[in-house]
Amino acid sequence: MSKKPMQKFMDWLQYKVTPAVQKFTERPWVHGFSAGIVKCLPFILTGCLIFFYNVVQPYFPNILPNLSAVSNYTFSMLSLLVAFMMVYQEMGSLKHRNYQVVGGLTGICAYILAMKGTTVDGVYSVTWNRFGPTGIVVAICIGLYVSIIFHLIAKLNLFKNNNTIPEFVQEWIKNIIPIFLSILLLKIVIIDLDVDLYPICLLYTSPSPRDRSLSR
């Protein structure tokens, strides 16, 4: 007796799709990417909690304090957090644990550079919403870019058979090279070529006019 269509479909999901998806998600780059996003979820949920709180707060202004600042410095910092955590988790998944913190901090520096802030009379100004969810696609791209630079340098195995240079000096050089390259290459794109990544990412991630008309 042949299996019912639904049973065939369930078997296909269980024995074909599930193993393929599991194998895909176990790849170091994919695992690091997903882990970087998951680690930022508590900050997203904190912001959501404040949004719900702000619905109730205006009805009891004399009792409940305004907690918008909590959301501003958690959820509204999401892109900055992603820029750090993306590199941190990728370095862990790729077995470059000595680069996790330095790589993550470089991700933050690179993301701030990509924000294209302006300095006037010693005052640095940048669009506030670029810290938050608005810039998350740019933050992911920056995180992956920095991860690639650090991964390529790590694969060179600098000073592998060198015992003459002190170990702490070796660590300095191993860190300086990927930091320098990450910021230098991005500086050429952002400052010298005057490229703003935000409109580019928005162009490719926002729905097309046709999609918007269909959703109405």
Tell where the protein language model's regions lie, with residue ranges.
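Short, Lys/Arg-rich, polar N-terminal cytosolic tail immediately upstream
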Residues: 1-24
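Cytosolic juxtamembrane amphipathic/interface segments immediately preceding
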Residues: 16-34, 162-170
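Early transmembrane hairpin of solute transport permeases
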Residues: 22-157
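Small-residue-rich segments of transmembrane alpha-helices in multi-pass membrane proteins
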Residues: 108-112, 171-180
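Juxtamembrane interface elements at the cytosolic ends of transmembrane helices
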Residues: 145-162, 189-201
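Conserved, well-structured core segments that form the ligand-binding/active-site neighborhood
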Residues: 151, 167-175, 187
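Selective recognition of specific alpha-helical transmembrane segments in multi-pass small-molecule
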Residues: 175-190, 206, 216
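Conserved small/polar residues in nucleotide/adenosyl-binding loops
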Residues: 204-211
